[in-house]
UniProtKB/Swiss-Prot annotation:
It is a multi-pass membrane protein. It catalyses: [(1->4)-beta-D-glucosyl](n) + UDP-alpha-D-glucose = [(1->4)-beta-D-glucosyl](n+1) + UDP + H(+). Substrate binds at residues 246, 248. This is Cellulose synthase catalytic subunit [UDP-forming]. Disulfide bonds: none annotated.
């Protein structure tokens, strides 16, 4: 476990302060008595837990026990601090383990092979979910919340840094933002070298790098994709540290000063990761119109999971927005090339050799999210395949060099991508009873409710409290439903043959000129929606005209099916691609700006948003500017003004849109320094969403699901109209009777 006292963790109250102090004193004990005490405590705790989860209770007693635990949860949720979270975790584990013990010992008396097939399939999926739940609590219950260590030495003593910007097929208009921002980082210029690693071997990139003064590196092949590109650059550079940025990840000027302090404090630190923050919406946010309103898919990982990994010294390298110490990286043979998720595998290798990895939850760079659902799915397929490859070839639960906390964190990251089959099981399990009459639970309906409800409610409320602003309840099911069908085959193939499959590059940038429904990608969601609708029909029929003695069982399965319909309908909604007409995403920001008009007037205003093509502005004092007028925009930093020629392309009262005229390379670099590279550009948006409330989140997902059904209806009508318009009509004479 990482020393929490040295990293100044976030403290929420006196109880946490006392606990942190006790942990620090305990860590100073000699190793032998400390180990004995830990082992003895674990054994006693396990015995107590086993007694609680295995205690046989009748229906009344189980309901009473569940009610008492639920009341305790309601009280604990109102208590601030992480000790209350730990108590919630304990109650959740009790409820879930009691359920699983009862499930394995009292509900598996299947009578037919159909019951056995569906019943054991569901149990296997539930067991997987329980393991992921337990490992997830270990990861996230006590995030470290590391804070920066500021550099205390003079700049002349700071280490040398090589900045690697690997690129393959990204447009120069995207990559140049990252290049300009890397050059603008606050670091001694004689100790900072920027390298563009071009696996696309493009001459215009070479010429651009020559003009702006950065090093251009290309190789003759693309062996091992990104990992091979980075390793080739390691051979021709010599900086003490390497800062890595994907081609579309634009660093702030404070990136190195915020990140390097920990390396100078901890000589065993090999890698420090910062969040991947995105200034454009991902396909879920774009297609569902939830950008900045609902936490996106990645916010849980970068907002909470990585912070939790940091407590156990198990921070993952994520391929970008990170700093690596050169010496340990060379010691493990460079960036890992055995799998397609070279980043996570590299971190695992570093941890196995005893090096530390760290996470700093302060966004110091931002990039483009995948624009379309198809690109998003392709990216997740690569991640899933790579994690399965690591699990198969370098399993963190086996081998030397890792502590148990590290093993759990790495294993859970890999097991997470195995959700494809369990998610499909959960989405179809109630249909086994409603359609086929299979008894997947060999127990009374009321006993099922008495054990299942506490398990589900406790896990939902506990995760809601832990995840807070980084993941709203029920959205995990939506994300998994969209991806489950697509990640299942590559995961299974990678487990059987880890060498199968190649590295697919995630395309970034581009426009979607019209809205359309992606019927091809939506096929799995439509199938799931259809079979659940069929199951709903069967269930309603049984509820009205079936045996009254099975009414409660039918009602339980109908409720489950209705929930699955909400989730699958939301997945259908994601498949409706919204338009994206801007080639350059706009970033919301309020910056003071002066506008010099053609007639000599100087007006004050504030930016509303910006891109590399222009500004959205709000003029002060009720002024206005005519559309089409040419102006100069003045931005200031540290008392120095920078002027940019622009033309007003939109004007409505005090609100105007200004598009830049042709800017020189120096002006483009200065614009990036004054906008994207500002130290505080992304901090205000980090974790700023509304805290999760399960009922509100259910309404949220439910409304999206209803919208998905309407979207499907409109898309179906549109396809019918197109089909009818393409139907050829026969000339009148072909319809006449012939003699």
């Amino acid at each position: 476990m990482t020393d929490t006292t040295s990293s100044t963790p976030f403290v929420e109250g006196r109880a946490e302060q006392r606990l942190n102090g006790a942990i620090a004193r305990f860590n100073r004990w000699p190793s032998a008595p400390r180990t004995v005490l830990v082992v003895a405590s674990c054994v006693l705790g396990a015995m107590l837990l086993l007694g609680i989860i295995s205690a046989p209770l009748d229906l009344y007693s189980q309901c009473l026990f569940a009610a008492v635990c639920f009341l305790a949860v309601l009280v604990l949720r109102k208590i601030p601090g992480r000790l209350a979270i730990l108590a919630l975790v304990v109650l959740s584990l009790v409820a879930s383990l009691r359920y699983m013990f009862w499930r394995l010992t009292s509900t598996l008396g299947f009578e037919t092979w159909v019951d056995m097939f569906f019943g054991y399939g569901l149990v296997a999926a539930e067991f997987y979910a329980l393991i992921v739940l337990i490992f997830g609590y270990v990861q996230t219950a006590w995030p470290l919340r590391r804070t920066p260590v500021w550099l205390k030495t003079e700049p002349e003593e700071w280490p040398t840094v090589d900045v690697f910007i690997p690129t393959y097929n990204e447009a120069l208009s995207i990559v140049k933002l990252t290049i300009f921002a890397a050059q603008a980082m606050d670091w001694p210029k004689d100790k900072l070298r920027v390298h563009v690693l071009d696996d696309g071997r493009r001459d215009d990139f070479r010429e651009f790098c020559r003009k702006v003064g950065v090093n251009y590196i290309r190789r003759d092949n693309n062996f091992h994709a990104k990992a091979g590109n980075l390793n080739e650059a390691l051979k021709v550079t010599d900086g003490e540290y390497i800062a890595l940025f994907d081609a579309d990840h634009v660093p702030t000027r404070s990136f190195l000063q915020v990140s390097l302090g920990w390396f100078l404090k901890d000589p065993k630190l090999a890698m420090l990761q910062t969040p991947h923050f995105f200034f454009s919406p991902d396909p879920f946010e774009k297609n569902l119109d939830t950008f900045r309103a609902v936490p996106n898919e990645g916010e849980l990982f970068y907002g909470l999971v990585q912070d939790g990994n940091d407590l156990w010294n198990a921070t993952f390298f994520c391929g970008s927005c990170a700093v690596i110490r050169r010496e340990p990286l060379l010691e493990i043979g460079g960036v890992a090339v055995e799998t397609v998720t070279e980043d996570a595998h590299t971190a695992l290798k570093l941890n196995r050799l005893g090096y530390n990895t760290a996470y700093l939850a302060i966004p110091q760079a931002a990039g483009l999210a995948t624009e379309s659902l198809s690109r998003h799915i392709n990216q997740r397929i690569r991640w899933a395949r790579g994690m399965a490859q690591i699990f198969r070839t370098d399993n963190p639960l086996l081998g030397k060099g890792l502590k148990w906390g590290q093993r759990i964190c790495y294993a859970n990251a890999m097991l997470h991508f195995f959700y494809g089959l369990p998610r499909l099981v959960f989405l179809t399990a109630p249909l086994a009873y409603l359609i086929f009459g299979a008894e997947i639970f060999h127990a009374s309906a009321l006993m099922i409710v008495a054990y299942v409800l506490p398990h589900l409610v406790h896990s939902s409320l506990t995760n809601s409290r832990i995840q807070g602003r980084f993941r709203h309840s029920f959205w995990n099911e939506v994300y998994e439903t969209v991806l489950a069908w697509y990640i299942l085959p590559p995961v299974l193939v990678a487990l059987v043959n880890p060498k199968a499959g190649g590295f697919n590059v995630t395309d970034k940038g581009g426009i979607i000129d019209k809205q359309f429904f992606d019927w091809k990608l939506a096929r799995p969601y439509l199938v799931l929606l259809a079979v659940n609708l069929i199951g709903l029909g069967f269930g309603i029929h049984q509820l009205i005209w079936g045996d009254a003695s099975t009414a409660v069982t039918v009602a339980i399965n109908l409720t489950w099916t209705l929930y699955n319909l909400i989730i699958t309908s939301a997945a259908v909604a994601v498949a409706s691609e919204a338009r994206q007409v801007r080639s350059e995403p706009r970033v919301s920001a309020k910056l003071p700006v002066s506008i010099i008009c053609a007639d000599g007037r100087v007006l004050d205003g504030t930016t509303q948003d910006f891109s590399q093509n222009g500004f959205g502005l709000m003029l002060s004092d009720g002024h206005s500017i005519t559309q089409g007028e040419r102006v100069q925009l003045v931005l200031s930093r540290n008392g120095q003004d920078s002027l940019f020629d622009a033309r007003v392309v939109f004007s409505k009262g005090a609100q105007i849109g200004a598009q830049f005229e042709a800017l020189s390379l120096r002006q483009q670099s200065e614009l990036v320094r004054l906008t994207f590279s500002r130290a505080d550009t992304w901090a205000a948006s980090w974790g700023a969403g509304q805290p999760d409330t399960p009922l509100a989140a259910l309404r949220e997902v439910g409304s999206i699901g209803i919208g998905g059904l309407f979207t499907l209806g409109r898309a179906t009508l549109h396809e019918l109209r197109l089909a009818l318009s393409r139907t050829p009509t026969k000339p009148l004479d072909t319809l006449m009777d012939k003699p």
